[in-house]
Each structure stands twice: as structure tokens, then as C-alpha cells.
């Protein structure tokens, strides 16, 4: 005989769920946004750039259908992240420049097996978070640029056989990283670009030419469609090696001091190239015109003012 659940208990359960979903007036008060599905369940919360507190994240952890959470440019701490540990249904987490987050807080997501997209760019995470990410084998997009990760920590990413997008920044281009890159053959988007030399009060310095080992490693990623190498030492020789990437449609080379008209000549051989950013490089209007003639329909962003051709 099946046990009978009192009607009052059922009503209480539904009421508690309703309260969890509806008691989010503070999100609007902070200037955030909420998205619901057809049944009224909260499936996405955007708190980008708000003054959300750690304790307020407890309300979000109680949302059973929450899939997307944007906490970018907030001041939440590791304590707030740990409050989110029960939110295992989250598929997309954006912590872009949530600058107080470290590996300790990121331990909250180690059991989030549904997570597909993770952005921790500009946080204080290091190799511990890479190890956690490596255990989330369903990840499709990962941004760890401008963090404290090291070259050796990237080994943890090898199990990510579904990874399509990776951003790590140019500062981690060591030998170990190159070996890891060669194994990430599912990548369609790769960002190895560095920051603008003047960003964060830094003075402009010259960038050494990129060793041939770097483009050689990248050239093995045959599924790439977007490649970003901004403010790196890539030049004509490296672009010649990369011309074997016949699916790349978008190439970002802004601020690359070794990119000149000779480099543009090499790009004429790129079979699928549709968009090119060569702002703040040494290309000339004549070189740009020649590439446009060779690659009909290509969109080129050039010059210090970002002129579109």
C-alpha cells in the first residue's frame, strides 16, 4: 500500500518553491535581470556590474531550474560562491572580472556536471580551478585569461574532449602549453591575445617575434574558425605556417608589431578568411587594398582609428 502524503504537505512544498522563485525582488532593485521559462521558473539571472552581496546568492542557490548566471564585474567573494554549491543545474557561469574570486570559491562548482560555459577571466583563480574544470568533461567554453594560472596547470584541460572555445592569453605560451594545445583538437575558437601594452598603467614595450613552435602547434587545430593573437609577436612567417587552417574565418591581429604588408601577402592564401583585424600594426593602405583584391568580400579593420574596408 502506497503511503499517503497529506494534502497540506504537498501545498507547503509548492508554496516553498513559489517563494524561492518569486522572492527575487532584490534582483530588480539592484538593476539585474531575470528570465523565466513558459512555466514561470527562473532559468537565468543577470547581475552584471551590480552590488550583489554574498548572502543574496543564497536565494539563487534555491532556484531548481536555474541554468545561466552572470556575476561579471561584481564584488562577490569566495563565500558567495560557496553558497552556490547546490546550484548544480547551472549550464553557464560568467565571473568575468569578479576580482575577489579564488580557487577556494571555485571549489563550489566541482560537481556541476551540467556546466557548459565558464568565464573566470580577470579573477584571482590559479591552477586549482583548472583542475576543477578538467573534471567537468562536458565543458564547451572556457576563459581563464588574465588569471594566475601557470603553464603546468594546463595539463588538467586534456580530458575536455568537447571543448570548443578556449581563451588563455599570451602570457602562458610555454612549452607545456603548446603540447596541451595540440591535444585540444575540438577547438573552434582560440584566444591567445595579450592585453593592450598601455592597459593597467603598463608602458608600451616591443614584443619579441613568436617562436615557430607556437604557430606549428596551433596549425594542428584543424577545426579552428576564430583565432585571436592580438598584441603578440606573430609575423609573416608564423602566418605562413597557419595558412593550413582552412576553416578560419575570423583572425584578430590588432597590435601585432610584426604584422606588415608581407604578412598580408601570406593572408591572401587563407582559404576561408572573411574578417581581419590589423589595427595598430605596420600594414599600409596599399597592402590592405592588395589583400582586398586577392580576397574578394573580406572585411578588414585597420589603422589606429579602426577603419573598416
PLM region descriptions:
Residues 40-217, 222-262, 266-283, 294-309:
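Concave beta-strand-loop units of leucine-rich repeat
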Residues 27, 38-40:
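Short, surface-exposed loop/turn motifs at beta-strand boundaries within globular domains
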Residues 31-36, 299-301:
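Short secondary-structure junctions
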Residues 19-32:
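Surface-exposed cap/linker segments adjacent to membranes
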Residues 1-10:
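Bacterial N-terminal signal peptides that target proteins for export
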Residues 285-288:
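Short, surface-exposed alpha-helical segments at coil->helix boundaries
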Residues 15-17:
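N-terminal signal peptide c-region/cleavage motif recognized by signal peptidases
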Amino acid at each position: 500500500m502506497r503511503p499517503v502524503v497529506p494534502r497540506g504537505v504537498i501545498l507547503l512544498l509548492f508554496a516553498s518553491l513559489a517563494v524561492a522563485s518569486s522572492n527575487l525582488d532584490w534582483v530588480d532593485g539592484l538593476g539585474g535581470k531575470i528570465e523565466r521559462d513558459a512555466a514561470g521558473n527562473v532559468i537565468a539571472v543577470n547581475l552584471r556590474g551590480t552590488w550583489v552581496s554574498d548572502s543574496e546568492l543564497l536565494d539563487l542557490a534555491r532556484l531548481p531550474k536555474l541554468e545561466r548566471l552572470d556575476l561579471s564585474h561584481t564584488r562577490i567573494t569566495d563565500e558567495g560562491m560557496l553558497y552556490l554549491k547546490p546550484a548544480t543545474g547551472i549550464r553557464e557561469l560568467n565571473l568575468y572580472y569578479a576580482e575577489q574570486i579564488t580557487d577556494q570559491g571555485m571549489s563550489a562548482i566541482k560537481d556541476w556536471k551540467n556546466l557548459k560555459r565558464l568565464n573566470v577571466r580577470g579573477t584571482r583563480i590559479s591552477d586549482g580551478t583548472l583542475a576543477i574544470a578538467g573534471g567537468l568533461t562536458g565543458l564547451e567554453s572556457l576563459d581563464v585569461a588574465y588569471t594566475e594560472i601557470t603553464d603546468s596547470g594546463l595539463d588538467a584541460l586534456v580530458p575536455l574532449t568537447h571543448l570548443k572555445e578556449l581563451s588563455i592569453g599570451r602570457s602562458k605560451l610555454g612549452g607545456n602549453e603548446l603540447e596541451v594545445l595540440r591535444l585540444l583538437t575540438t577547438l573552434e575558437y582560440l584566444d591567445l591575445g595579450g592585453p593592450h601594452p598601455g592597459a593597467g598603467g603598463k608602458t608600451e614595450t616591443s614584443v619579441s617575434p613568436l617562436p615557430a613552435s607556437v604557430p606549428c602547434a596551433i596549425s594542428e587545430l584543424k577545426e579552428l574558425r576564430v583565432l585571436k593573437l592580438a598584441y603578440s609577436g606573430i609575423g609573416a612567417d608564423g602566418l605562413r605556417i597557419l595558412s593550413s587552417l582552412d576553416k578560419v574565418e575570423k583572425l584578430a591581429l590588432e597590435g601585432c608589431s610584426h604584422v606588415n604588408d608581407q604578412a598580408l601577402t601570406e593572408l591572401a592564401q587563407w582559404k576561408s578568411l572573411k574578417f581581419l583585424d590589423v589595427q595598430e600594426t605596420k600594414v599600409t593602405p596599399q597592402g590592405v587594398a592588395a589583400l582586398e583584391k586577392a580576397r574578394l568580400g573580406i572585411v578588414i579593420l585597420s589603422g589606429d582609428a579602426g577603419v573598416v574596408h
